[in-house]
Amino acid sequence: AIDTDLAELRSILVRLAKALAPGLDAKAVAGELRERVLEELDYEYEAQNQRAFARAYDGHPFIYVPKVHSRLSRRRVLVSDYVEGEGFEAVKRLPQDERDIYGEIIFRFCFGSIYHLQHFNADTHPGNYLPMEDGRVAFLDFGMTKRLSPDQIQLEQRAIDAAGRDDAEALREALHDLGFVANPDRVEAERLMEHVKMVGGWYMEDREVQITPERVMKMVEVTSDPRSDFFDLVRRESLPADELMGRRMETGLL
């Protein structure tokens, strides 16, 4: 049944891509999505992921990943340490300064894992982050993760550095090398920079940034609304299959 649903999703993605994003390799993206979903249903694979993150963050001052009990776990059963923590509704009632700390910890975990482990959790969902009494945040659910090669991470750093320096030509070149821009000569570098800053500038700016609902809606608009000033640019861009989970992590984090 799952394979049938995923095959139908692939068909829908291909049809949508032809109309909305001709540059997108929808079959490759659907294949990546299928692989990650099937991994998420395999609890033995999830246990391997969770053990890797638990080892990496063992003793960390503000990040906690529960230990997996391998002898009690099976392909369809995953047992780990019990965590006492607050839910997201409790987080929303915290004072602003405490919410800022909570948000910073999650940001550092999500993005820091990429650069420190070459491995990140793509399932960014508020139910997976539990503030603990000692000030740490517990991170749960490692069924959907993604590993990146050092070369890919280096290319992403090039793109972020170029955006931070406002070097539009270098940004266009880096995004071409990553596979986001197939034909750089057809994409104006300055417009591409403006588009990237509107969508991802919140984590490229070296200052405190407040993420408001209005800012999030603007990000959605410039990437998906045909009436957007950037929609013609979006149609010339692509989404490499290897970048799908990274973008999922970013949007979920927002």
List PLM regions with ranges.
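Helix-rich C-lobe and terminal helical cap/extension of kinase-like folds
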Residues: V29-L33, R74, V83-I105, M132-L254
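Conserved ATP-binding subdomain of kinase catalytic cores across diverse folds
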Residues: A1-E89, I101, I105, H116-L117, ...
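Hydrophobic HxD+1 residue recognition
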Residues: A122-P126
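Hydrophobic residue at the +6 position relative to the catalytic HRD Asp in the kinase catalytic loop
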Residues: G127-P131
